[in-house]
């Protein structure tokens, strides 16, 4: 039969500890791999940001659509235990294949460090990701439900606590993996050419998935395993279709109404199946509003991360990168879950308040809505600090005097005086049809120029004499979306120069011309200037000042009297000033909402599902996550909202409306005990059929010898 009651630890079945460790390792594997995907697509395979993002979100969506398939396999064919084992094997193979796809030497026959056939790597990677999506999605609804199966009747408190521990394991694995795997990626490895170590970074998640599988199998002898119930989904669909058809045939008033529309299936299906379907449909009906929560929650990895790129990551002695702010969510979960279970919920119970599962979920949705209100308020404050970029019908220009004389620059409506080696304080904005000419005056010499300026762009006018100038299109229309710093160089030597800065090369910068911007993370960056016109005795190595977040600078390279280079820095875009720590309140609100919404949702889905449909209902719960991501694409894409704070308010308002609707729906929901209902049906069947000990033997645990 099942596990002995003596095999317990601290009042919990010993088997669940294997399940929790299994989940920790699996989540480490999944999130560690997922943290690398975008950079792998862009830097290794060479896709642009848009295609990389599309493939990434397609993969994530697939991971949340395949749980339906996993639930069907578990409930109709293999059972939860075997489904977890076999799909974990598929999962492990997928991780290994993905790691293989990142090995340069797979097609690098000439050993130059670049794959000779990228399509081969793409094909291998896609096969690996498909296997991972099938594996991780397939086991998602089974593991939590299988853990719930291990508890005896009367252990509801321990089972509820298990779902909290289970969720804690998920986030602990996620936190460690998102810290460790990026650290491994930046290491250098390779057989012939040393470069970013994607094979090992993907390989560690593959190893953890293998460990997850081994740990799960070790606990096999302790698990309670239930026989699969047959193709239950097919029965459910047929029963529902028959009920609808039968009701439609008997729609005239001469036929008496029945208590529930599913009761119209009684002519063909037994009452026990109908009662089970009623339980499932009532819960699925409650699921309808839930995707809106995930629509907001999953924007931590997109909109909130982009918001962080416009902020400063200096927090005391720490320096936080924009994408690392997501770890705040995981850290807060690890802190809040024990506090909620050990302090908050017991206090609420002592106060005599009936804090039901659906009430908790309603509170969670409200907190998530308030998190986006906080994000909107923060965005308004951030917008006040951001530079103004030109609109589609505008041009912006600043003047940089790289000559040896003072100059007066006359533009429509304003005149500025520039000393040698200086620039205007800020970019000046004009309608594209008003800036038709500029006067440059030096002493008694006046030159009128008619620059060609591109609408919607920033430009720099390099001037070194009234009749010697160059207009440079800056190419910056926004701050870096990664919080990086843009650096360009202007050469005033008569010969071209080359600059190497932190491994990036600015090649052949022409005389009195500017390079393109290249982008760097925060910190002090060293650079080397080289040219045929610079003597070997000259100093060539320089260091930048400390680069903060989101800035842009022009480094002017001029010749001293000795002919040696001299560097002058000019600020093009100021660094971010709002600190990322201001995001913590919104992360606290969204995480608090997640703790009372998501953990409770898992617990509620299990407790209200009949014994033969628990995995299906868990899959339905996970499906709401996929639908939530689709909502983000629809609202964000169709809304065309220019102000980000307004989009945050829109999402907050939508969830608030959905929260009210859900509260009303929850008000009319009646909690049931599926085990009691099924036991009553069993008792009734035994009375009707005394010769049969058990009409539904599938409800009994299976002997280990049968597995």
From Swiss-Prot:
Instruction: List keywords of the entry alphabetically.
Output: Cell membrane, Glycoprotein, Membrane, Peptide transport, Protein transport, Symport, Transmembrane, Transmembrane helix, Transport
The UniProt catalytic activity note for this protein reads: a dipeptide(out) + H(+)(out) = a dipeptide(in) + H(+)(in); an L-amino acid tripeptide(out) + H(+)(out) = an L-amino acid tripeptide(in) + H(+)(in); L-alanyl-L-lysine(out) + H(+)(out) = L-alanyl-L-lysine(in) + H(+)(in); L-alanyl-L-proline(out) + H(+)(out) = L-alanyl-L-proline(in) + H(+)(in)
Cite the pH-dependence comment: Optimum pH is 5.5 for glycyl-sarcosine transporter activity.
Q: What is its main location?
A: membrane
Instruction: Give the highest taxon in the source lineage.
Output: Eukaryota
- In the UniProt record, which residues carry a glycan? 50, 439, 498, 513
Instruction: Map out region (Disordered) in residue numbers.
Output: 682-707
Q: What does this protein do?
A: Electrogenic proton-coupled amino-acid transporter that transports oligopeptides of 2 to 4 amino acids with a preference for dipeptides. Transports neutral and monovalently charged peptides with a proton to peptide stoichiometry of 1:1 or 2:1. Primarily responsible for the absorption of dietary di- and tripeptides from the small intestinal lumen. Mediates transepithelial transport of muramyl and N-formylated bacterial dipeptides contributing to recognition of pathogenic bacteria by the mucosal immune system.
List the protein's name: Solute carrier family 15 member 1
Query: What does the organism's lineage look like at the top?
Result: Eukaryota, Metazoa, Chordata, Craniata, Vertebrata
Gene for this chain = SLC15A1
């Amino acid at each position: 039969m099942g596990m002995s009651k003596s095999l317990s630890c601290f009042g919990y079945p010993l088997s669940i500890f294997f399940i929790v460790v299994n989940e920790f390792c699996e989540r480490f594997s999944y999130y560690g791999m997922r943290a690398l995907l975008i950079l792998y697509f862009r830097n290794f395979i060479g896709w642009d940001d848009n295609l990389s993002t599309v493939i990434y979100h397609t993969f994530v969506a697939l991971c949340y659509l395949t749980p339906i398939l996993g639930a069907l396999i578990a409930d109709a064919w293999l059972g939860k235990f075997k489904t977890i084992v076999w799909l974990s094997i598929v999962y492990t193979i997928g991780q290994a294949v993905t790691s293989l796809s990142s090995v340069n030497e797979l097609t690098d026959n000439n050993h130059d460090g670049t794959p000779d056939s990228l399509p081969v790597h793409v094909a291998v990677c896609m096969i690996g990701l498909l296997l991972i999506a099938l594996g991780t999605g397939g086991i998602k609804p089974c593991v939590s439900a299988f853990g719930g199966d291990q508890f005896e009747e009367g252990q509801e408190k321990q089972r509820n606590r298990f779902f909290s521990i289970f969720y804690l394991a998920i986030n602990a694995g996620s936190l460690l993996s998102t810290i460790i795997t990026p650290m491994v990626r930046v290491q250098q490895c390779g057989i012939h050419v040393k470069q970013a170590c994607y094979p090992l970074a993907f390989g560690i998640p593959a190893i953890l998935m293998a460990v997850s599988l081994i740990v799960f199998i070790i606990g096999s002898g302790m698990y309670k395993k239930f026989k699969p119930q047959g193709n239950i989904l097919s029965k459910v669909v047929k029963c529902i279709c028959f009920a609808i058809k039968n009701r439609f045939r008997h729609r005239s008033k001469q036929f008496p109404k029945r208590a529930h529309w599913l009761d119209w299936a009684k002519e063909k299906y037994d009452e026990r199946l109908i009662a089970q379907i009623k339980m499932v449909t009532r819960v699925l009906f409650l699921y309808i509003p839930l995707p809106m929560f995930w629509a907001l929650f999953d924007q931590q990895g997109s909109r909130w991360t982009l918001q962080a790129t416009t902020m400063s990551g200096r927090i005391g002695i720490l320096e936080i990168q924009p994408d690392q702010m997501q770890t705040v969510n995981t850290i807060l979960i690890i802190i809040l879950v024990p506090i909620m279970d050990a302090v908050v919920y017991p206090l609420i119970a002592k106060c005599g308040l009936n804090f039901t599962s659906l009430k908790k979920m309603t509170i969670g949705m409200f907190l998530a809505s308030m998190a986006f209100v906080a994000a909107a308020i923060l965005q308004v404050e951030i917008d006040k600090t951001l530079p103004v970029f030109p609109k589609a019908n505008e041009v912006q220009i600043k003047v940089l005097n790289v000559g040896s004389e003072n100059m007066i620059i006359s533009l429509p409506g304003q005149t500025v005086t520039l000393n040698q080696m200086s620039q205007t304080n800020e970019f000046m904005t004009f309608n594209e049809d008003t800036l038709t000419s500029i006067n440059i005056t030096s002493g008694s010499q006046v030159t009128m120029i008619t620059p060609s300026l591109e609408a919607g762009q920033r430009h720099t006018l390099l001037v070194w004499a009234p009749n010697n100038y160059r207009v440079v299109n800056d190419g910056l229309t926004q701050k870096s979306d990664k919080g990086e710093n843009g650096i360009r160089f202007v050469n005033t030597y008569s010969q071209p120069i080359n600059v190497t800065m932190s491994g990036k090369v600015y090649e052949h910068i022409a005389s009195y011309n500017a390079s393109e911007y290249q982008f760097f993370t925060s910190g002090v960056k060293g650079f080397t200037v080289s040219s045929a016109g610079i003597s070997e005795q000259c100093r060539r190595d320089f260091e930048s000042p400390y680069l903060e977040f989101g800035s842009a600078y022009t480094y002017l390279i001029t010749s001293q009297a000795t002919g040696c280079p001299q560097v002058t820095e000019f600020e093009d875009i100021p660094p971010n000033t709002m600190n990322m720590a201001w995001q913590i309140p919104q992360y606290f609100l969204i995480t608090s909402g997640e703790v009372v919404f998501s953990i409770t949702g898992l617990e509620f889905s299990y407790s209200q599902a009949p014994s033969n449909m628990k995995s299906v209902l868990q899959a339905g719960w996970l499906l709401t996550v996929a639908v939530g991501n689709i909502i983000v694409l629809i609202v964000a894409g169709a809304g065309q909202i220019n102000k980000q704070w307004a989009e945050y308010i829109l999402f907050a308002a939508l969830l608030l409306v959905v929260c009210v609707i859900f509260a009303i729906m929850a008000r009319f929901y009646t909690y049931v005990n599926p085990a009691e209902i099924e036991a009553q049906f069993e008792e009734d069947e035994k009375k009707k059929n005394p010769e049969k000990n058990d009409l539904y033997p599938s409800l009994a645990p299976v002997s280990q010898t049968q597995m």
